[in-house]
Amino acid sequence: MLHLVDYALLKPYLTLEEVARGARRAEELGVAAYCVNPLYAPYVRELLSRVKLCVVADFPFGAMPTAARAALVARIAEYAEEIDVVAPIGLVKSHMWGEVRRDLLSVVGAAGGRVVKVIVEEPYLTDEERHRLYDIVAESGAHFIKSSTGFAEEAYARQLGNPTYSTPERAAAIARYIRERGFRLGVKMAGGIRTAEQAKAIIDAIGFGTDPTKVRLGTSTPEALRTLG
């Protein structure tokens, strides 16, 4: 099920040569999308034909002002098919829901119809915060809730009783909320998905089948998931 995989190379120390090599590998594997930082996107887009280019925005902190976030997303939308943007985490944790709503409406709107996955950073959230944020993501017109950047701080997550990695339980909870609310959102799980067994358990837990418009898995090690088919 490599057609559900977003192959991500997002470490800040990667060289252009390494990222270009990743693009060629993405094409060989036939993943859904190849996800990179904005700096590298113009260099690798010509290397992709059957694989979509995904670019992250305000990654990994979600701490830029709304105007800057929207401007960046609009620029990325000129050359990328998909955009993974981090939610304004500080505003979420401050429970400034009106500001969160204004931000995401502006940022998602700036994408001009490109596929947008909003990274909610599950490890940092309480259940109340999750649900309020999911509601706003749905209202914003985004296409996916994405679970995590994969860069979450373990010490803070532990204080909230949350893992920093993807689990079938968390995937099921997100999907269940989407179904109960009748949202037209997909689920992308990211963080610590390194085996085919993990991936299958998460896909099964989501319960949306194997449609890449509804289910994605983010990983930096797609080769490990090849046995999924």
From Swiss-Prot:
Main location: cytoplasm
Active-site residues, record numbering mapped to chain: D84, K146, K188
UniProt-listed InterPro entries: Aldolase_TIM (IPR013785), DeoC (IPR011343), DeoC/FbaB/LacD_aldolase (IPR002915), DeoC_typeI (IPR028581)
Keywords: Cytoplasm, Lyase, Schiff base
Gene for this chain: deoC
Annotated pathway: Carbohydrate degradation; 2-deoxy-D-ribose 1-phosphate degradation; D-glyceraldehyde 3-phosphate and acetaldehyde from 2-deoxy-alpha-D-ribose 1-phosphate: step 2/2
Protein name: Deoxyribose-phosphate aldolase
Catalysis: reaction(s): 2-deoxy-D-ribose 5-phosphate = D-glyceraldehyde 3-phosphate + acetaldehyde
Subcellular location: Cytoplasm
Organism from which the protein derives: Pyrobaculum neutrophilum (strain DSM 2338 / JCM 9278 / NBRC 100436 / V24Sta) (Thermoproteus neutrophilus)
Function: Catalyzes a reversible aldol reaction between acetaldehyde and D-glyceraldehyde 3-phosphate to generate 2-deoxy-D-ribose 5-phosphate.
GO cellular component, one term: cytoplasm
The organism's taxonomic lineage, starting at the top: Archaea, Thermoproteota, Thermoprotei, Thermoproteales, Thermoproteaceae
Keyword Amino-acid biosynthesis appears in the UniProt entry: no
Highest taxon, organism lineage: Archaea
